[in-house]
Amino acid sequence: MLCNRTCPSSDCGILCNHSVPSFPPFHSSVANIHFTKENNLKSNIFEHNNNSPTLRSSSVACNTCLKIIRNDSFHCTKCFDFDVCRDCYAKQAFLHPCPKPHFVLVRSSIPSVASLTCSVNSMSVSPQSNFMYAICDHCEQPIHNVRYKCSVCDDYDICESCLTDNSHSNTHAFVRITKAYPHGLPSFHLFPQFLSAELFESASTVHRSVQCDNCLAHPIVGPRFHCLVCEDYDLCSSCVSHVHHDHHSMLRLTREISASPLHLSKPEKPKVLNFDFKLVEDSILPLELSPGCPFYKIWHIRNTSCQSWPSPLYVKFNGGDKLFPGDNPYSFPITSSVHPGEDVNFTVALKVPEKSNKEIFTAFFNICSDDGSVFHKSLCAFLRVPKSFSRISKSSF
């Protein structure tokens, strides 16, 4: 496309985007393309506005569609790691929490196939590389082929390279996943392996009562992989990469946790208490929040059942978005019995996410007794974040 401005030449191969309103004005061209003896493609990419070129590696994923960026993209200079591919930028189909975003065009270090009519073999990305639709929480790079997901936390994934040196809790076991899930993968919500890091360190790395079902090694020394689909099927670290069904998730256990074979099942549902209540009012403190700011969510409820509630009572997280660090938020306990018709305030300490592409956050909580029993109705915390992420008012809840 030629622009209405004065260009050096209409035959110089200049690509003009002045007439496209979705992109900032620029002229760019690809020059000095040559092949080495190793058939590696090299190019010098420059812009006519005399700015220094910015090259992009092929390992960056779009923060909107999560696809690997092959061509040019846009990077927010105000943020540490926020990139949008050209398609999502043109459609304006992305949510960015930065108060004052400033996007700059970033050139791909590998020219596109369409523009250079080169073969697919010249690309540096292996055709066998399988994107797992997840970003490593340790190295912040896209995860390929093998994904390790925390079995306890809602959203924590690492790649195979970061498995041994990640800083995540060693009491949490990881699940080995080899199947890509484009539409997301539900959390496993298993219990931690050990109650404390001290118990984990004191446990043995030899799984005395377990035998590898492939090489028949007994006992399994080092990481043990337990199939979450099959009944009583375990593999050692040497066999897990080339045997068994590719799409079966395997729980990775680094320490011995029992003297008998592991039989995983869903946790027993807690006892349900048929106490009824009515939500009178809910509020937050402070009234104005900013990213990363801690706050209190308060539910003012009334006992509408015919009997008194036992004490103590707590609020426990039951799903949705995690608006708190750790496994559960701090809840202020109700230390006295609540009689029919009486009002009580349940308060939980939460925190506004510091960086997120989401606009709406929803978290659910249960009222629990001291023995783990739960009320049959849940409490909900709803948070709507403005696109500017500069102010969050009380009306957002």
Curated annotation (Swiss-Prot):
Sites where the protein binds Zn(2+) 3: 136, 139, 159, 162
Ligand binding (Zn(2+) 1): 62, 65, 85, 88
Superkingdom field: Eukaryota
Main localization (coarse): Golgi
Record keywords: Endosome, Golgi apparatus, Metal-binding, Repeat, Vacuole, Zinc, Zinc-finger
GO cellular component, one term: NVT complex
Keyword check for Lipid metabolism: no
PANTHER family recorded: OVARIAN CARCINOMA ANTIGEN CA125-RELATED (PTHR20930), PROTEIN ILRUN (PTHR20930:SF0)
Function description: Autophagy receptor that interacts with and facilitates the transport of cytosolic hydrolases Ape2, Ape4 and Lap2, and of mannosidase Ams1 into vacuoles. This Nbr1-mediated vacuolar targeting (NVT) pathway depends on the endosomal sorting complexes required for transport (ESCRTs). NVT components colocalize with ESCRTs at multivesicular bodies (MVBs) and rely on ubiquitination for their transport.
Record protein name field: Autophagy receptor Nbr1
Gene: nbr1
